[in-house]
Amino acid sequence: MKTALIIASLLMATFVIYLFILGAMSRNGKAPGLIEGSLARCPDKPNCVCSEYDKDTRHYITPIAIPERGTDHLLSNIKNTIIDMGGSMQAETGQYLAASFSSDLFGFVDDFEVRIDLSRHVIHVRSASRVGTSDLGVNRKRAEAFSKRISRMMPSMEQSSIAPSGPG
């Protein structure tokens, strides 16, 4: 009984150390960026979601619809939303943003990428863990929470772009 308890404790300690090592490893990386103008496809692991590839049903999330006009403050609203959600901005190029999120306990880093497609009037999102296999649904939940927050801003952005009508 005592031996089993010691073995179980050693296995648990080894597992916790392994998680801290994975967390440290995830800090050495960056988002994949745009590949031929689109967000990268998700790897064959469950810890990634992306709105670019609807045929990849396992990883697919719906892109965020944006109005045809009223996108003047869209980029700043996206950045502010990411920061409000606890993300750190990593890169910004034109209509592309990359950010990272870190877990509190083990410091796992996830990449969060956004591509604004003004021609199709959508925002594409990709959220993926840098290491490991399972994320317990964290990336999907993050992408969905981001989508809800940005979607709630759309009516006010569209209204702010409509010029006030003055006297004749």
Annotate each predicted stretch with a short phrase.
Residues 3-7, 17-168:
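Ser/Thr-rich, low-complexity intrinsically disordered terminal regions
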